């Protein structure tokens, strides 16, 4: 029975005109791509070198600490200088000349420097604590602008003879 069906299908195909018969597309060569790997797919990632915990490496000229510490101090200093100018009317240079201003300056420098160095000396990277809004790059740029702002406050007071915020 199977033989009769196969023969009848051949016979029916022979009766059809040539234009209506569809032929299958010719199968081309298929290429086989082989990739060589030195490690297996489940190999552990290579170990990253740990951040140096030396004070000399952290405070090096190209190290992570100097610009960050200076930037953090400049951010605090800029906001504080503007607040004191707005509150008491003292300019930046008169704030630096007073004994109270120098004491607060020394205390702030010591505390922020230590608070900035401790995580670095424990092996954390500067980029390790990046959040959604504030990241390491934004902190650097904000610090740079605050440094420029402090220079602008001092220059304004020297040139005009009055504080930036005239109360």
Swiss-Prot record:
GO cellular component, one term: chloroplast membrane
Chief location: plastid
Subcellular location: Plastid, Chloroplast membrane
Induction: By light.
Upper lineage: Eukaryota, Viridiplantae, Streptophyta, Embryophyta, Tracheophyta
Transmembrane segments: 101-121, 145-165
Listed SUPFAM superfamilies: Chlorophyll a-b binding protein (SSF103511)
Topology versus the membrane: Multi-pass membrane protein
Organism: Hordeum vulgare
UniProt protein name: Low molecular mass early light-inducible protein HV60, chloroplastic
Residue ranges that the Swiss-Prot or TrEMBL entry lists as coiled coil: none
Alphabetical UniProt keywords: Chloroplast, Membrane, Plastid, Transit peptide, Transmembrane, Transmembrane helix
Disulfides per UniProt: none
Pfam families, alphabetized: Chloroa_b-bind
Role of this protein: Probably involved in the integration of pigments into the mature pigment-protein complexes.
Segment annotated as transit peptide: 1-33
Keyword Transmembrane helix: yes
Family: Belongs to the ELIP/psbS family.
PANTHER family: UPF0041 BRAIN PROTEIN 44-RELATED (PTHR14154)
């Amino acid at each position: 029975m199977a033989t009769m069906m196969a023969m009848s299908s051949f016979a029916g195909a022979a009766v059809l005109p040539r234009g209506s018969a569809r032929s299958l597309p010719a199968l081309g060569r298929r290429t086989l791509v082989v990739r060589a790997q030195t490690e297996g797919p489940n190999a552990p990632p290579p170990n990253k070198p740990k951040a140096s915990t030396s004070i000399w490496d952290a405070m090096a000229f190209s190290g992570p600490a100097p610009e960050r510490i200076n930037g953090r101090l400049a951010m605090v200093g800029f906001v504080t200088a503007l607040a004191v100018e707005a509150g008491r009317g003292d300019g930046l240079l008169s704030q630096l000349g007073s004994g109270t201003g120098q004491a607060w300056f020394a205390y702030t420098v010591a505390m922020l420097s230590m608070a900035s160095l401790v995580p670095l000396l424990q092996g954390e990277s500067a980029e390790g604590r990046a959040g959604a809004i504030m990241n390491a790059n934004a902190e650097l740029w904000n610090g740079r602008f605050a440094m420029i702002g402090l220079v602008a406050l001092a220059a304004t007071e020297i040139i005009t003879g009055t504080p930036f915020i005239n109360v």
